[in-house]
Amino acid sequence: AASDVYKRQQVPMSTWSGIRNKLESDYLCPALRGHIQYFATSYSKSADHEGRAAIRMDGVEVLRSNYYTYFENVWTKFTQLRSTTMKDCDSTKEAINLSHAHALEQGTFDQKVFYEAFGIFDNQSIENSLVSENPLVRIFALLDRRLGKRRLLALEESMEQELDWVRAFYVTRMQAEGLMDRE
């Protein structure tokens, strides 16, 4: 269910430099090494040290979001759900989970959601990551060295149903592997 996308995962928290090193060195496919960089930060003067996260391609942020954009999307969806279909108190938690899932599907997240997605990815198989309900986990899987060319080609049909911003990483990987022309 869509509401399961945002369920908080209890995973051991690593340092950001450790997470980045694993993503860029251990997991990233050789064809994209030096081209893809992961970025996350929290701002010490911000309430609760909120921050932002991004994935860069050759120094350009191709996917980025921050706490404030993420929270605005969550709150907008939550108030819409509470004013229409989920008015009773029993459905508040479901409305919150659906709101977080909706915001993530829209491509908005904060650094904490980014870290949680990595924790999920790092603690499950590539097969489970490719079909994860969390789109960030699917991106990590699409860029993973364990995903071979045959398997990448086999994903083509399922990518037609994928979120646009996730599909863009599939195209990037296909081009890097020489399986698709650069347009």
Regions found by a protein language model. Name each.
Residues 1-6:
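Short, small-residue-biased leader/transition segments that mark boundaries at the very start
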Residues 7-183:
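Alpha-helical scaffold segments
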